């Protein structure tokens, strides 16, 4: 075979969507630009698929079809400005079940007391420590936020203890968080209206946190129980797993939207295992699969476990959720009439 024949090998005809981006002279809005994402390629195509999947779920729900939407996210999502987007989704009842980590609970409460401050990645962390300033990436959290948080949490623990004594049983973590929402409603001002916990309480949307003690809430519980050695305050994790699994089992269809990895991701897809897998899945992650971690496991790996149905509609978008999620939510919830560019 000649070199030319090798290099210019004849190809078979293939059918498919033409790779094409927006011509900016013609685009009239950001929505029009994003409508091309599906055709751009690479992760833009995956984001386009995520928009398509969530729109399908939302349109079914609007027609009255039962699809229970599970939303999972790690604490850094609430550390960032995505907190307000998630709070809006909860306020508008666009999700039905939430799973997060301890930071995803406590930082939401803290932000209703005092804001986090935009900082920088390249700083002297030893100097920050001297100043009592904690760093989450390029977000600064002065320690006075946690001091203020303690002022609210210690009386809240006393309140929970009275509730548990009245019920003659411990509260589950989801009940504990529900009571936090009630407490916010009673004690805090207007800023609570940007809170996930507050709107979850108002709309009776459960927030599950299997690792509720793995953060500042755990620190406060330590201080509380050390100072009150006879305290019977307990948070029940066991009954929450029953409640979470049953929310999956009893759903006609489920959709799982997961930002990041870790515990929230597995808690949601494992609950869906009990019903034969979730029907729709959107992962947004920067984790890689080659280390075998759950955080990096792609949706198709979940299929092998029965946690995602073999015929499910799913996609993983690799990238920073702070870039991706605002576009995704806007295109699904606010720009519904903007379809794919032809």
UniProtKB/Swiss-Prot annotation:
<comment type="pathway">
    <text>Protein modification; eIF5A hypusination.</text>
</comment>
<feature type="active site" description="Nucleophile">
    <location>
        <position position="307"/>
    </location>
</feature>
<dbReference type="InterPro" id="IPR036982">
    <property type="entry name" value="Deoxyhypusine_synthase_sf"/>
</dbReference>
<dbReference type="InterPro" id="IPR029035">
    <property type="entry name" value="DHS-like_NAD/FAD-binding_dom"/>
</dbReference>
<comment type="similarity">
    <text>Belongs to the deoxyhypusine synthase family.</text>
</comment>
<comment type="function">
    <text>Catalyzes the NAD-dependent oxidative cleavage of spermidine and the subsequent transfer of the butylamine moiety of spermidine to the epsilon-amino group of a specific lysine residue of the eIF-5A precursor protein to form the intermediate deoxyhypusine residue.</text>
</comment>
<dbReference type="InterPro" id="IPR022899">
    <property type="entry name" value="Deoxyhypus_synthase_arc"/>
</dbReference>
<dbReference type="InterPro" id="IPR002773">
    <property type="entry name" value="Deoxyhypusine_synthase"/>
</dbReference>
<keyword id="KW-0386">Hypusine biosynthesis</keyword>
<dbReference type="Pfam" id="PF01916">
    <property type="entry name" value="DS"/>
</dbReference>
<protein>
    <recommendedName>
        <fullName>Probable deoxyhypusine synthase</fullName>
        <ecNumber>2.5.1.46</ecNumber>
    </recommendedName>
</protein>
<dbReference type="GO" id="GO:0034038">
    <property type="term" value="F:deoxyhypusine synthase activity"/>
</dbReference>
<dbReference type="GO" id="GO:0005737">
    <property type="term" value="C:cytoplasm"/>
</dbReference>
<keyword id="KW-0808">Transferase</keyword>
<keyword id="KW-0520">NAD</keyword>
């Amino acid at each position: 075979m000649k070199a030319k024949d090798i290099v210019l090998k004849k190809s078979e005809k293939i059918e498919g969507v033409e790779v094409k981006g927006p011509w900016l002279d013609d685009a009239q809005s950001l929505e029009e630009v994003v409508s091309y994402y599906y055709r751009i390629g690479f992760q833009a195509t995956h984001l386009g698929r995520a928009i398509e999947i969530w729109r399908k779920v939302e349109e079914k729900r609007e027609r009255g079809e039962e699809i229970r939407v599970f939303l999972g996210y790690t604490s850094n999502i609430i550390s960032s400005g995505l907190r307000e987007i998630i709070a809006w989704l909860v306020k508008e009842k666009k999700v039905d079940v939430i799973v997060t980590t301890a930071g995803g609970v406590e930082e939401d409460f803290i932000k209703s007391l005092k804001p986090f401050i935009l900082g920088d990645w390249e700083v002297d962390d030893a100097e920050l420590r001297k100043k009592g300033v904690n760093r989450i990436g390029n977000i600064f959290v002065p320690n006075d936020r946690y001091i203020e948080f303690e002022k609210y949490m210690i009386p809240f623990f006393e309140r929970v203890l009275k509730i548990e004594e009245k019920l003659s049983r411990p509260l589950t973590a989801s009940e504990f968080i529900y009571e936090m929402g009630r407490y916010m409603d009673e004690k805090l001002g207007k800023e609570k209206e940007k809170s996930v916990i507050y709107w979850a309480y108002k709309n009776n949307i459960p927030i599950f946190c299997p690792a509720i003690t793995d953060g500042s809430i755990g620190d406060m519980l330590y201080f509380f129980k050390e100072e009150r050695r006879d305290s019977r305050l307990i948070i029940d994790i066991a009954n929450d797993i029953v409640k979470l699994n049953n929310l999956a089992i009893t759903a006609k269809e489920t959709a799982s939207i997961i930002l990041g990895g870790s515990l929230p991701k597995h808690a949601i897809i494992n609950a869906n295992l009990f019903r034969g897998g979730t029907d729709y899945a959107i992962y947004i992650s920067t984790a890689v699969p080659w280390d075998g971690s759950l955080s990096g496991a792609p949706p198709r790996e979940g299929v092998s476990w029965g946690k995602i149905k073999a015929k499910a509609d799913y996609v993983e978008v690799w990238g920073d959720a702070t870039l991706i999620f605002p576009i995704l939510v806007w295109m699904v919830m606010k720009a519904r009439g903007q379809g794919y560019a032809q």
